[in-house]
C-alpha cells in the first residue's frame, strides 16, 4: 500500500509582486510541470508585502526574460494578507527585508513556514543566496534572478517532495 503524501501550497514574496515573486511563481510552476509534479501541489502563487503594484502585470523585463526561456507568465500583482499564513505551507521571500516584513504580519500560530528562497541554495558557488531586487538594474540583473530562481526551484523540488 502506497501512502500518498499531502499536497502543499507555496507562495513567493517580494516587495511589490512586480519583478521577482511573479518570476518565481512562473518558474516554479514551469519546473513543477517539467517534473510532472502538479499532483503534489494545491496552490502556487505570489504576492508582494506592499500594495505598490496591485492589479498590475509584472515588470516588462520579468515578462521578457521568462518568455526568452519558454516560461509562461500570466499574473496580476497582489498583496499578502494575514489569512494567507494559514492557506500556504511555505511563504518564501526573496531577501531579508521580505522576511522581516513577513514576520511582522505573520499571525502567531499560523501554519506557514516563512523562509528565504535562498535557504535551498546548496552553497556550491552556482548562485548567490539572496535574490536582489532588479528594479533599478538592467536586463542582466533579471537574467541572474532567473538563474537563481530556477536553481532554487529545482533544489526545493528535490528536497521537499
Swiss-Prot record:
The active site is at residues 14, 20, 133. One of its GO terms (cellular component) is cytoplasm. It catalyses: O-phospho-L-tyrosyl-[protein] + H2O = L-tyrosyl-[protein] + phosphate; a phosphate monoester + H2O = an alcohol + phosphate. Gene3D superfamilies: 3.40.50.2300. It is an enzyme of class 3 (hydrolase). It comes from the Eukaryota. Present with 3500 molecules/cell in log phase SD medium. Belongs to the low molecular weight phosphotyrosine protein phosphatase family. PANTHER family: LOW MOLECULAR WEIGHT PHOSPHOTYROSINE PROTEIN PHOSPHATASE, LOW MOLECULAR WEIGHT PROTEIN TYROSINE PHOSPHATASE. This is Low molecular weight phosphotyrosine protein phosphatase. It comes from Saccharomyces cerevisiae (strain ATCC 204508 / S288c). The gene is LTP1.
Amino acid at each position: 500500500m502506497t501512502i500518498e503524501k499531502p499536497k502543499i501550497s507555496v507562495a513567493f514574496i517580494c516587495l511589490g509582486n512586480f519583478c521577482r515573486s511573479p518570476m518565481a511563481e512562473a518558474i516554479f510552476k514551469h519546473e513543477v510541470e517539467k517534473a510532472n509534479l502538479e499532483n503534489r501541489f494545491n496552490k502556487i502563487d505570489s504576492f508582494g508585502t506592499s500594495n505598490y503594484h496591485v492589479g498590475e502585470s509584472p515588470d516588462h523585463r520579468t515578462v521578457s526574460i521568462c518568455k526568452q526561456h519558454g516560461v509562461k507568465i500570466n499574473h496580476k500583482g497582489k498583496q499578502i494578507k494575514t489569512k494567507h499564513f494559514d492557506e500556504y505551507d511555505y511563504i518564501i521571500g526573496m531577501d531579508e527585508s521580505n522576511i522581516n516584513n513577513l514576520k511582522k504580519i505573520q499571525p502567531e500560530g499560523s501554519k506557514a513556514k516563512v523562509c528565504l528562497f535562498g535557504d535551498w541554495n546548496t552553497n556550491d558557488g552556482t548562485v548567490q543566496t539572496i535574490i536582489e531586487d532588479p528594479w533599478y538594474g538592467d536586463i542582466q540583473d533579471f537574467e541572474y534572478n532567473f538563474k537563481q530562481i530556477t536553481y532554487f526551484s529545482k533544489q526545493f523540488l528535490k528536497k521537499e517532495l
